Amino acid sequence: MAVFSTNLVIYKFTDFEQTFVLEDSQSNSAKDLTGFTGTCKMQRTLNLGSLTAFNLAFTNRALGKVRITLTSTQTANIADGKYFYELMLTDPNGVTERVIEGVVIVKHPVTYPSDPPLTPFVPQVP
């Protein structure tokens, strides 16, 4: 299976969800993912730093559908910035390959207060 590259945007304090539909590169039809396992992780620098794991679910194995998610609690704990991610699948024979990769941009939504809340400055008058 060829590696597909796509970029993602995640907003802190919100739930994140992305569904991918994988195709068999030889037949151009849905990739049957019966018996496959998978992981999807992101990190700030390639091959360095801590990893953040996405929740991964096969929503329809016969049609090649894989969903990655993060809860609002998980996104709240990710620093704003640029990350790299990859989705790895392992077939029933134990062969692991990267099927999707790309850049993740984590943003702080404008409509949410900064974390932690700011204390208002009150000047003292002598």
Where are these regions (language model features)?
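Contiguous segments within soluble domain cores/interaction surfaces
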Residues: 1-126
